[in-house]
Amino acid sequence: NKHSLFIKESAMPELLKQEIQTLININNIENIGSIFNNINSSESIGLDFNSTTFYFLDLLRKQKINTKNLANPCILLKAIKNETELDGAKKAHIRDGVSITKYIYWLKNIMDPKSNDEISVAQHLESLRRKNELFHSLSFDTISAIDKNAALPHYRVTEEGKSFFSDNNIYLVDSGGQYFDGTTDITRTIILGEATTEQKDRFTRVLKGHIALSNHVFEKGTKGTDIDYLAR
């Protein structure tokens, strides 16, 4: 039996559909409920309870179908990149890095603080990325934050609440580009003006933490969630 992929069919390019439909069954995501309702009660269904939505768990349990908690087999396969993906990621990051370098130079040497705010500088960064012929879109809405706004997790600037630059600011930009060969996500905190003694101390502590982390030997079984406290 073929595996089945439930997806919004209108979002799938026709060429891709033709390539993979010989290997798997393609079903419209809107039909998944009715298909689940027709599963034989003698069947057993494997689900990852940590990531499956309650909708599907509830649907199967109402039909008294036996469910088993299994690790999602796609996770590891998605995490392991092939040579084409690795090469694309490297090239995308190099090109994106050029845009970021131009942006930081512009912020420090060209940008007029009196006529710019959190939104206008984010738009300038996007314009630099768009000059790349392989640029598709932003990988997420740019987090552009001046001073105290930079302390807010996943800050979202609005036209009404935007902050303006002065002669002395800390500016955080968390942004990324979606390219046809890779996706980027980069965060930089930039001092515009003269850094205070306290700022120098805090930045130095963070740098020391990063250096120590980069030299750390991770034992087998170390989780990504362990990285933060190790750096601290």
Task: Annotate the PLM regions.
Residues N1-R232:
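Active-site neighborhoods and metal-handling regions in enzymes and metal-associated proteins
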